[in-house]
Amino acid sequence: MGGYLLLGAFLGCGVVFSEALLRSRCGLIRLWFGLVIGLIMMMWSPIPFAFAMRFTRAAQLCGLALSAAIAAGSALIMRGKARYRGVFQGDMPVWMLLCLLIPLAILSGYLQYTHTLREIDGALHVGQSTYGDINMHTGIATHLRNAAFPPDYPILKGARLGYPFLGDSMITSMLLFGADMAVSFRITGTLMMVLVGFGFVAFAWEMTKKPLAVVVAFLLLFVNGGLGFIYTMDGESFREIFTGFYKTPTNMPEYNLRWVNVICDMFIPQRTFLTGWTVLLPAVYLLLLAVREKKRRLFISLGLWAGLMPMIHTHSFLGLGLVSAGVMLQALIGSSDRRKTLINFLLYGGVAVLMAIPQLLIWTVPQTVEGSTMLLRFNWVNNNGDGTLIDNYFWFWIKNVGPVYLLLIPAALCQKRRSPARGFMLGALLLYVVAECVVFQKNIYDNNKLFYVAFMVCLPAVGALLADAIDAIGRIRSLGAKAACAAVMGVFCAICLLSGSLSIGREIASDYVLFSESEAAAGQFIDTETAEDAVFLTGEQHNCVPSALAGRDLVCGSPTFLSYHGLNYAVQHADRRAMLENPAENAALFEKYGVDYAYISNYERGKYAVGEAWFAEHGTLVFESGSVRIYALS
């Protein structure tokens, strides 16, 4: 219970802070910013204290006290000043907001429940999209309990954790006060999805002021998908969408379809992406307000906000920066006072960079630069690796993104010359070009996290273009012509949304056992009966019980995670095999890594010629269930 109260306390601090500083904005905007600020406080405020006292309950309480002091101080300073009292500012329709956010909240809540360690008869179940990534996030969340700072990876002993971990550390904060891990992931995940949904509605409304444009843009973002459905037209392929593992029309690598649905394959499984967008949408909204209102305090506030983003989600931070560069260029072109405009943007960028540098130097640079994960590569996953393309350049993007791709340039050209939308689309173009030419991680696929930011900021303009087209159809006098145009528009929208809808349907139906009853019991035993700094010798499975369910250190984890994170694990990988297969001859390695336990299951027995007789003779069998055995070695 204490963990949920802690979350509520931080959210309350954020709302109080927002109520004080955003007094000129409507109630819903203040609430949105307040809840996001509360999450940021929960992620960031314990960190300075963790360097001094580890990531303990004391650090969380100190962080909460700091957040409460900031909130109370801002409320006192702004006391008595006028406040906008309306729930809505302007004429945003209530029906539009409810019709968009309620289904999103229900869908998100359901998927968070079914996809996050759902217990059935003692086993832990997940969905298709979380079968892989959830192991990394639960491992980090459990590993950070009482950890020294800066922390290390749980899956590679001694390697500094360079992955943006703050979205997982908020779960750690809740765990330290007794919250259930699965419930904590579900509550915060659903909350963040709703905040992302509202944030996009607010941004699209400010850009267009057209309800139909907002609805269209919202659907194109959250039900996104390309032309993959054409590969599922026969009965067998269509059935496989709902029964096969990753046979959805938005994620078919065999057909070079990699533009996945953002709900199914990004927001639900990739918690860092979801947390990043939770913080990104208010930043984009602030950027729009700053350009429109030309107030210096908005630019400085935006700089402070952006400066907190790198360790929340580095891709979102980079995406915001490149989009902002395009917005700045457009603002300078149309400004009557270019000096003031330039100073405003320099203040914004300067504050953000100064705050980001320590984060980048401590965490990001050692992993990205020293790990040699940056490289030049044209056209994302459509590149064979030798400079040649798998598909024709434009066909690749059309079949992945769908017909929406063809509307991006017309939508930009239809904007007024000094419209902020042009600046955002110029920024999207800059981001698109960079993401098309530079890969920032060994997992080339991860550049989609940049493409999605570019896609998102373009959608309000695309929605406005389609809304204008629909309005024009309504004004046609000839019934025949009107019917024909309406049919064309209907087919167009169906093509845009069909692949995404099928993918969401598959995700709703998916159910996989991630940890068997014996493995779940082993995880519970490890979590409660072994020391938090215990080191485990295991196989290389991605769903490794000691790390995923208890956050314990491993000699070496899954190559899938380690390679994509740019970590050099060759020595540890070889040493693991030597210790598992020839433990009698490798006593020095056990001492080198400080191995406390050996975790032996059917996976280890199938992957390695495990010298289990040696472990049974020289270790102590402390846990046995089904095929799982845990031997204490020290």
Please give the residue ranges for each predicted region.
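Membrane-embedded, hydrophobic transmembrane alpha-helices
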Residues: 1-92
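Membrane-interface helix-loop-helix junctions at transmembrane boundaries of multi-pass membrane enzymes
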Residues: 83, 87-93, 290-298, 334-347, ...
